[in-house]
Amino acid sequence: MKLPKEGDFITIQSYKHDGSLHRTWRDTMVLKTTENAIIGVNDHTLVTESDGRRWVTREPAIVYFHKKYWFNIIAMIRDNGTSYYCNMASPYYXDEXALKYIDYDLDVKIFTDGEKRXLDVEEYERHKRKMNYSDDLDYILKEHVKILVXWINNGRGPFSEAYVNIWYKRYVELKNR
């Protein structure tokens, strides 16, 4: 897939370590691309689960993917503030069909009041055994949890209110063209 440009719509696919498709988002709008990162927005985006169930995202969400970090970030813009869902995942890669990454189960959720919660630790441990995650992979993921927490605590990138506001404003401008 050639690098998408601002205003393009792309498909995002998450996989599990064993190569099975986990979840697909249709029509994510690209807001910015750089050599290493893609910023987009999901707003009433169709999501298809691996079992065929479908649902639509409820609110606008700024999505951040990077080629060097082992996480991606979803900033969900709600009436009472921004909440975040962070997936520990492989750096993204793209082909002619979609932006793709491997989801490694561990998640961090940040609520609008700032509360942070690690999620799915048991699922990660179960899949680590079942899918034979290497010690190196386990180390990388745990180190990137530390990097992610430093970003959260320091309001870096997507965790800055200004960042969310800038990209949401750009989305509204593109949507209303």
From Swiss-Prot:
Keyword Disulfide bond set for record: no
Active site, renumbered: R23
Reaction(s) this enzyme catalyzes, per UniProt: a ribonucleoside 5'-triphosphate + H2O = a ribonucleoside 5'-diphosphate + phosphate + H(+); a ribonucleoside 5'-diphosphate + H2O = a ribonucleoside 5'-phosphate + phosphate + H(+)
Cofactor(s) annotated in UniProt: Mg(2+)
Listed EC numbers: 3.6.1.15, 3.6.1.6
UniProt GO MF annotations: magnesium ion binding; nucleoside diphosphate phosphatase activity; ribonucleoside triphosphate phosphatase activity
Keyword Hydrolase assigned: yes
Highest taxon above the source species: Bacteria
Binding site for Mg(2+) 2: D105, D107, D120, E123
Enzyme superclass (EC): hydrolase
Positions of Mg(2+) 1 binding: N87, D103, D107
Keywords, ordered alphabetically: Hydrolase, Magnesium, Metal-binding
PANTHER family, sorted: PTHR39159, UPF0374 PROTEIN YGAC
HAMAP family per the UniProt record, alphabetical: Ntdp
Protein family: Belongs to the Ntdp family.
Physiological role: Has nucleoside phosphatase activity towards nucleoside triphosphates and nucleoside diphosphates.
Name this polypeptide is given: Nucleoside triphosphate/diphosphate phosphatase
